[in-house]
Amino acid sequence: MTNQVTIIGAGNLTTSLLTAIHRKKFSYKINVIDTDKKKKLVLKKFNVSFFASYTDVLTESDLLILMVKPNNYIQVIKEMNPYLSEKVVIVSFMAGIESSLIKSKLNHNVPVVRCMTNVTISDSESHVFYHMKPFSNKIVKRLDKFFNNFSKLKRCINEEDINKITALYGSGPAYYVYFNQIIKD
């Protein structure tokens, strides 16, 4: 393993995750891919490698974290497919997109783990809930190695539980952040 993680998407949840990572100062190389080049300035303080298009960094990554809007997932997977390797684990934080849908769009048979957390992860006070099918202790160890540096990893037996967690735990704080941004503006 290379201790390299690539995050696709640079929105609020990515910023929260990077804040937690930055505070803990652990030894992962972090890449972020987002087509909005303005996000590079926002992420500069986190000391990450920023890319505006898909590159070979996907091939070299241990974990590929999808943090894009669910309506963009088909295009994202289509664009990243040529760069995927068999060793990567895809970790999806996309609300409402089941693992089977992601797997059906991939060119490679790689593990897909569906996760959810919320913006409080920036304070290292959050849980990361996950579901994978089939279950693999080897993959859980990879997830533990990364996420347990700044959060608590919790397994969901059923993928439906991730949908419930998304509604209550993921979306609630996100709407609060959105509401506060509207008030400020």
Where are each of the predicted segments found?
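Hydrophobic/aromatic beta-strand patches that form the interior of the parallel beta-sheet core
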Residues: 31-33, 51, 91, 113-115, ...
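Rossmann-like NAD(P)(H) cofactor-binding subdomain of soluble oxidoreductases
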Residues: 17-18, 46, 54-66, 70-127
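Glycine/serine-rich anion-binding loops at beta->alpha junctions
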Residues: 116-121, 166-177
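Short alpha-helical
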Residues: 12, 37-38, 71-72, 97, ...
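A structural micro-motif
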Residues: 3, 28, 48, 88, ...
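Internal alpha-helical scaffold of NAD(P)-dependent oxidoreductase catalytic cores
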Residues: 101, 105-111, 127-164, 175-185
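NAD(P)+-binding Rossmann beta1-loop-alpha1 motif at the extreme N-terminus of oxidoreductases
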Residues: 1-52, 56, 125-126
